[in-house]
């Protein structure tokens, strides 16, 4: 097995502040690897290290078999990068800007830019500074994908994109994978990348908390449930639910509508079966924001 | 070799120029306006009845020498005092300050340098090409200056040797390049536009002040030796021709400063 990205104890400190703390990651060639974590977890720092925009304090990284520092410009021609905060300015059209980036990246096949722009619904004749955030993001995606690089490094690629374009983006990722390209992407929301990524690493405070496939991560994710009942006794419901080991933080608010809230770790099967005898008016299962589910993951890891 | 075929010549310099041509147009108009305003006025001052010398004589002691107005009666002295040594110098300093601080530090502060760096270009290439873009724009303003002064040479009566006009404009160009090299290097080292601007404007101002102080008396004449402004203009290039040795020193220092800036830039983290 070859690795498109391999890091060993990769560490980046800014003064006393540790942005990335001894991260070991391997991304298999041809895979789609997601990195999730709250803002400030170190996702962007890790990506900048891979592109030699910043240098590690200690540890090392290998990208496409080379160190980003010694690989230099030639290595970066084989990478397509989308920065997390894409700032595009200037009185130039999208087409002219992309032409410039094509000149300083790997060779771009004729017609490729137009094909990508059309897929994403991006107007290349407009001046860059007049573009909305979503359209700038599309421009950023085009410049990352256009030279069909061996490795795509995409920081929060779906941010600002509407759901239809997100779908198109996911199909571009799948095509890239089909072509043998490797995709390394980040998000602060698991749901945005769960359909794309084979493997996911959860980052928190600069360390990798967990690595696994999406299914196993989802199974261990903590979700918040809200259930409304009518025509039932609050005490009966409480008794039935207290018996469930997966359910925590239970509250039962009595009234005409009895509202039950709680958090569920893992599958919700047992919960659904436990409430089946009662009259359920509404059932909402919400994925917690990643901040809290990562905290749960983190504390679970610490307790084991 | 297919990769080298798609590589084009100086992509970053061309982008730099393409992004800035509107601004350059404005600077060209400013430089042209200053020359077209000041140089033709010489004929109205230079006549026997103009009393120009009397006006200078009436200025407080030291002010005339501070402003470099000792020799306003000759065409060379007049163009030196009004354009090359004053308005032109100020315009070149401001242009060099703005352009050099924007080239690396401004781009870094705005966040767009990150994306350029992520492509197939080295830091050294970015430093070299963007510096070249700034130098080219300053060269353009120098060429415009020389051509306009030469165009007005007869009609205004300044009566300068064409080679000396070119020498004087090369000296002005040199001071612009020196200021720009400090702005580019400090911008590349610190990534801060304010530091870059301070360095570029500061080196010009320092040279001007040292020269003015050196003009005051023979006791402090040695201050001239420290002033790039004096290196460029001290020998009165419009009447005597350029002092190529001193200009070589100015361009040499600029090159060293740029190399130092590129050296540090190549080794530091780029922030966003």
Where are the language model's segments positioned?
Chain A
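Structural motif
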Residues: 149, 245-248, 278-279
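C-terminal coupling/interaction segments
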Residues: 263-304
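ABC transporter nucleotide-binding domains
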Residues: 2-7, 12-204, 208-210
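Generic beta-strand hydrophobic packing signal
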Residues: 8-10, 250, 283
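ABC transporter nucleotide-binding domain
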Residues: 169-261
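Hydrophobic alpha-helical segments typical of transmembrane helices
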Residues: 97, 112, 116, 213, ...
């Amino acid at each position: 097995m070859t690795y498109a990205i391999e890091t060993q104890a990769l560490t980046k400190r800014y003064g006393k502040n540790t942005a990335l703390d001894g991260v070991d990651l391997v991304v298999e060639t041809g895979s789609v690897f997601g990195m999730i974590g709250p803002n400030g977890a170190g996702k962007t720092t890790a990506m900048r290290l891979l592109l030699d925009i910043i240098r590690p304090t200690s540890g090392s990284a290998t990208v496409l078999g080379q160190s980003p520092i010694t690989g230099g410009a030639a290595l970066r021609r084989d990478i397509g990068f989308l920065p997390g905060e894409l700032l595009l300015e200037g009185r130039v059209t999208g087409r002219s800007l992309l032409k410039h980036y094509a000149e300083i990246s790997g060779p771009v096949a004729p017609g490729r830019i137009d094909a990508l722009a059309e897929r994403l619904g991006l107007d290349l004749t407009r001046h860059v500074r007049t573009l909305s955030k979503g359209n700038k993001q599309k421009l950023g995606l085009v410049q990352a994908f256009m030279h069909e690089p061996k490795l795509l490094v995409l920081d929060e690629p779906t941010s600002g994109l509407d759901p239809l374009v997100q779908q198109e983006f996911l199909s571009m990722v799948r095509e890239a994978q089909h072509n043998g390209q490797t995709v390394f992407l980040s998000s602060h929301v698991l749901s945005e990348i769960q359909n794309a990524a084979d493997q996911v690493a959860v980052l928190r405070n600069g360390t990798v908390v967990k690595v696994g496939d999406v299914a196993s991560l989802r199974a261990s994710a903590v979700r918040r449930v809200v259930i409304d009942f009518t025509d039932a006794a609050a005490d009966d419901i409480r008794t039935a639910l207290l018996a469930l080991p997966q359910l925590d933080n239970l509250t039962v608010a009595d009234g005409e509508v009895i509202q039950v809230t709680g958090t569920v770790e893992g599958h919700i099967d047992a919960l659904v079966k436990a409430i089946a005898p009662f009259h359920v008016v509404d059932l909402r299962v919400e994925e917690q924001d990643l901040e809290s589910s990562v905290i749960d993951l983190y504390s679970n890891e610490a307790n084991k | 070799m297919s990769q080298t075929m798609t590589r084009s010549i100086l992509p970053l310099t061309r982008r730099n120029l393409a992004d800035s041509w509107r601004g350059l147009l404005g600077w060209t108009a400013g430089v042209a306006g200053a020359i077209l305003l000041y140089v033709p006025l010489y004929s109205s001052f230079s006549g026997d009845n103009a009393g120009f010398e009397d006006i200078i004589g009436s200025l407080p002691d030291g002010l005339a020498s501070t402003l470099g107005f000792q020799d306003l009666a000759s065409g060379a002295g007049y163009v030196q005092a009004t354009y090359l040594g004053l308005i032109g110098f100020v315009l070149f300093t401001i242009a060099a300050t703005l352009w050099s601080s924007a080239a690396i530090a401004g781009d870094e502060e705005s966040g767009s340098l990150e994306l350029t760096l992520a492509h197939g270009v080295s830091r050294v290439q970015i430093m070299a090409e963007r510096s070249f873009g700034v130098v080219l724009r300053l060269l353009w303003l120098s060429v415009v200056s020389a051509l306009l002064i030469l165009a007005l040479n007869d009609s205004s009566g300044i009566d300068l040797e064409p080679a000396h006009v070119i020498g004087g404009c090369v000296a002005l160009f040199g001071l612009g390049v020196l200021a720009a090299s400090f702005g580019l290097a400090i911008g590349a080292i610190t990534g801060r536009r304010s530091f870059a601007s301070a360095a570029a404007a500061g080196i010009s101002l320092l040279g001007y002040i040292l020269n003015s102080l050196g003009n005051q008396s023979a006791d402090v004449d040695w201050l001239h030796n420290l002033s790039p402004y004096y290196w460029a203009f001290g020998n009165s290039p419009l009447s005597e021709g350029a002092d190529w040795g001193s200009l070589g020193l100015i361009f040499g220092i600029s090159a060293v400063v740029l190399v130092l800036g590129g050296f540090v830039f190549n080794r530091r983290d780029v922030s966003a």
